[in-house]
Amino acid sequence: MRKVTIFIIIIVALTGFGSVRIKDIADFRGARDNQLFGIGVVVGLNGTGDSGQVNSTLLANMAKAFNVSIDSDSLKTKNSALVMVFADIPPFYKEGMRLDVSVASIGDAKSLEGGFLVQTPLYGADGNVYAVAQGNVSVGGFDVKVSANLQNKYRIVGYIPNGAIVEKEIPFEFVQSNSVTILLKKPDFTTSARVAQAINTTFERKIAKAVDASSIKIEVPSAFEDDIVTFLSLVEEVEVSVDQPARVVVNEKTGTVVFGGNVKILDFTLSYGVFNITVKNGKVESSEEVDATVSSLVSALKNLGATPQDIIAILQTMHSAGVLLADLVVM
């Protein structure tokens, strides 16, 4: 049988390609997710719960709060499990809105399947309760292709869609001293300067200033002092050309190479096995001389019959020699 090698090359124009909205590359300072956590009990397990004393003692104390006296020793039935409970609360969430919840076993429970999380307060980093979680725990479906051991491994982690109710809004201020700050998701000095320039051009006045590679400070115009929401929505829709550093990403296991369409290379002569390629005066010397980029080099190597492993090895050597003008990320 003929062995076929599949070589995947993905060319991504990472440098100066098109425009994107500010809302796609940045967030307003102060408007961020917050992590919540708590410790709770999952009940209703069919003998797959914890076997330890801690869980039964906790359940006995919970019953005591409802004036029900139960000996903790009588609760060692493995029908409950002590769990950590997690949720992320997005910005602007108000009381009564719902959050997705994740639960994970703390003890020696075998499975949380079929269990029910008893009402559990969820705390923020400041120690205050911001949400309460409760509901049926889902551990996902059964995959006949996966071994029983692997199935059991992931049945001690569960999920409760919309399982928590927000009880307290997390306070924040994103307008300070009549100004707001936007933070780039990927810091870059060039992009930061372009964002400030684009905002100033859109509003026809100098209200934005790039503070550093990640933050741009914007003064709120007097016309919008009583309508901040409209002003922020206009800022979000401003389009800007994004600049990204040159990068080549290779995956040795799959033979995948991802690189920007304009990643440049310096002059060099390559001799690798039966392959010989020369880059001179910024051109790849082949049947048709083309500009010296990673894209043109890879195309030339493919035409010579290079395998994915050959090309990855050549790129790594070029990076070590300093002729590849990009960061090389090997996965």
Curated annotation (Swiss-Prot):
Molecular function GO terms recorded: structural molecule activity
Keyword set, alphabetical order: Bacterial flagellum, Periplasm, Signal
Functional note: Assembles around the rod to form the L-ring and probably protects the motor/basal body from shearing forces during rotation.
Pfam families on file: FlgI (PF02119)
Lineage: Bacteria, Thermotogati, Thermotogota, Thermotogae, Thermotogales
Taxonomic source organism: Pseudothermotoga lettingae (strain ATCC BAA-301 / DSM 14385 / NBRC 107922 / TMO)
Family of the protein in this entry: Belongs to the FlgI family.
Subcellular locations according to the entry: Periplasm; Bacterial flagellum basal body
Segment forming the signal sequence: 1-22
InterPro entries assigned: Flag_FlgI
Name of this protein: Flagellar P-ring protein
GO biological process: bacterial-type flagellum-dependent cell motility
Subunit structure: The basal body constitutes a major portion of the flagellar organelle and consists of four rings (L,P,S, and M) mounted on a central rod.
One CC-aspect GO term: outer membrane-bounded periplasmic space
